[in-house]
């Protein structure tokens, strides 16, 4: 159980780092973290681009909105156990059943899906980010359901089934 907790902690820190970068980029771009102040400014910022390779003399432009969405989505991938950061969820079932039920029910794993849904006005301005959300969600859905079919331990079946259902929800957001 200790190894599972360590894995869950480390994988979620990867997601948290992406989420933190997304929040930082929102603050730098909009000057606020309040929904009521950010969403009205979306039309003014929608055309802004950043040259990611400018410091190296290259040229690769990406929309600021797309960068924000992708960083926020990395956070959602970690919290909602989407591929490739899904490895922690099945192992988290090693704990006591009440704790496992809390993790797999409506608490932690749905937070990432809720965040993507709550930021829908932002994600709607980035077709690239919407495609990434749909593809990752669909992949997670398929992988989770396929692995669930091969499991013999009921706790792992529930874990992979939860993974698949989270993939459905994430795909619907994309």
Predicted feature locations:
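Hydrophobic transmembrane alpha-helices and their helix-loop junctions in integral membrane proteins
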Residues: 1-174
